[in-house]
Amino acid sequence: SGADTVGFDCSGLTRYAFAGVGVLLPRWSGDQYTAGRHVPPAQARRGDLLFWGPGGSQHEAIFLGNGRMIEAQQTGVPVKVSPVRLSGMTPFVTRVIET
């Protein structure tokens, strides 16, 4: 999992995106869930990490604002912009970069 010659899984996409601005995230989504400050989803800002599953272990995406997110659903499937899915989302989003 992560990034390979085929593409990204969800945690690989977030690691790649944040590395582009000099922030090194842990490899696994559950570890990324605890890598920043937790804020309620209603206070999400562009660039915050969204998570699904217990402790953020099942999936993650990057919040883009206006109810949209960018995600890699699995390796080999194109990265896409999607509406934010609230079902199964963790009670907090993770803010890694404070502005």
Where are these regions (language model features)?
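Hydrophobic beta-strand signal
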Residues: L49-F51
